[in-house]
Amino acid sequence: DSSYYNTGEIVLMKKLPYRIVRNGKGDTRSIVKKTNIMGFTCLEQDCIYTDFPESVQEGDIIEFGNVGGYSIVSKPPFIQPNCKILSITPEGDLVEIKRQETYEDIFQTFNFNL
């Protein structure tokens, strides 16, 4: 789950590099070809990739590259918690550099006892 705000404004300027992790449920009825990849917000500009050229199905994971640090501060702090952030070490290992947020993380700054 992601949105335009997780990838940043670069998605409006160029096609991001991507990798698909095939995890589909094997239901060929759910295969989608040549589609727009939309984010989870209700905003019409929340388009991560226009005319995605490959077939994907429910359960597949699309990993977008070339996404920088501004993407973690641009996302609105509602609708859905931020995803975790991974970094690739020089040795090629994945390291979690920021854990996934929870709804508790989002709401802990609010005072609901008014």
Regions found by a protein language model. Give the residues of each.
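Charged (often Lys/Glu-rich) extended helix/loop segments that serve as interaction or gating elements
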Residues: 1-114
